[in-house]
Each structure stands twice: as structure tokens, then as C-alpha cells.
């Protein structure tokens, strides 16, 4: 039998799993079934997500890396892998166009449906790699598309974002759901509170959930 991905794909397993997970979401974001289910009202939601994903994978996330360094973190490797692979494979039909305007690099998606098909192709290949434990193919995919950083783009990102004084990482503060119970102990309503700072929430999680397995 085939071993677990952590055994067969070794140090590339996490990056490939992150890519697989992202690709599932990206593929279905452009599915009209989401409109049928009432989850979105227009496929512009998917298009905006595609724009953001390519921009982040190729440019924005580079603010987190020192100039000249390679990408080592799995989530970041995954995002560049997906974006750069799609750009290369879609280049014959100009699916994603690299534009230099006034000396600044931009990426413009010219065909969202074809990009969706490319995401599906990559998802199929990564699923095959994981299912078959194809270490060599997984290694080549990650090392070719997810590790090395274009020096010119990296330099430009750091220069363009420096005046913004923007933190390289962002955090989330989640709402706290407080159930209201009747005399029988049944939940009758939920009160949503969102009055914690990020630090307060981390301390709250540590106090209340640190013993969970």
C-alpha cells in the first residue's frame, strides 16, 4: 500500500497539502452552484478572490521575506507555487498577463474561466502526487514554482510597501459566541460579542482552551 503523505512526500507534504486545500477553494469559488445555494450573488466574488490570490502569491507576501532569501514557510510556498504555475501554464493563451506600468509590476487576469480550468488541472496533479506518494514529482513542483523568489519583483515590493509602514503579518480577532439557555438547558439564542483586543483574545484562548487535546 501507499504510506501517509508525511512519509512518502517528506518535507514537501505540508506545502502540497496547503496547495491542494487552496485549489479546492479556488476551483469552486467560480462555480455557479454557490449562487444556487445562496452563498454568493455573483461570480465576481470568485474573480476578486482570483485577483487577490495571484497578487498575494506573486507580490504581496514577499514583504515577509528578507531581500535575496528563498521562501521557506509552507503556506507561502504554496501560494507562489499555485500562482506561478498557473501563470506559466496559461502563458500560451495569455490567461494571466504580467504588466509593467511606470516601472511597476502588475498581474492581470485576462480569462477567469481558463484560470479556473488551470486550477483544476493543478489540483488533479497534486491529488495524484499525494495519492501515489510521488516524491520526485512533488519535489519538482515545489522547488520549481514555490521556493525561488524573483529578485526584481522582491526589490520592488519592498520599495513600494515601505512608505506604507505596513506590518508583514496580520492577525484576526474572532467574535465570542455566548449561548442563552432556557430552564431545560436548551439553547434559545446566541449573543455575539466582539470586544476583545488581539492580545486579550490570545490570553482568553490560553486560559480556556489550553488543556484541549
Can you annotate each of these PLM segments?
Residues 1-19:
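Post-HEXXH active-site segment of zinc metalloproteases
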Residues 3-6, 41, 156:
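Short, well-ordered helical secondary-structure segments
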Residues 14-31:
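An active-site-proximal "capping" alpha-helix that borders the catalytic cofactor pocket
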Residues 26-129:
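Long, well-structured alpha-helical subdomains associated
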Residues 97-213:
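Non-catalytic terminal regions of proteins
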Amino acid at each position: 500500500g501507499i504510506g501517509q503523505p508525511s512519509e512518502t512526500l517528506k518535507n514537501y507534504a505540508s506545502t502540497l497539502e496547503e496547495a491542494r486545500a487552496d485549489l479546492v477553494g479556488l476551483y469552486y469559488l467560480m462555480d455557479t452552484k454557490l449562487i444556487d445555494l445562496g452563498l454568493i450573488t455573483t461570480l465576481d466574488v470568485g474573480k476578486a478572490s482570483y485577483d487577490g490570490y495571484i497578487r498575494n502569491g506573486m507580490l504581496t507576501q514577499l514583504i515577509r521575506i528578507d531581500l535575496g532569501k528563498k521562501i521557506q514557510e509552507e503556506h507561502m510556498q504554496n501560494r507562489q507555487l499555485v500562482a506561478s504555475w498557473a501563470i506559466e501554464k496559461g502563458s500560451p493563451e495569455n490567461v494571466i498577463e504580467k504588466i509593467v506600468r511606470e516601472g511597476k509590476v502588475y498581474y492581470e487576469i485576462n480569462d477567469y474561466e481558463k484560470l479556473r480550468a488551470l486550477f483544476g488541472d493543478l489540483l488533479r496533479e497534486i491529488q495524484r502526487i499525494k495519492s501515489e506518494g510521488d516524491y520526485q514529482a512533488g519535489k519538482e513542483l515545489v522547488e520549481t514554482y514555490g521556493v525561488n523568489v524573483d529578485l526584481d519583483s522582491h526589490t520592488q515590493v519592498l520599495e513600494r510597501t515601505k512608505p506604507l509602514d505596513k506590518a508583514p503579518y496580520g492577525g484576526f480577532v474572532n467574535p465570542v459566541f455566548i449561548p442563552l439557555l432556557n430552564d431545560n438547558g436548551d439553547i434559545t439564542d446566541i449573543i455575539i460579542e466582539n470586544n476583545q483586543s488581539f492580545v486579550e483574545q490570545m490570553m482568553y484562548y490560553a486560559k480556556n482552551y489550553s488543556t484541549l487535546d
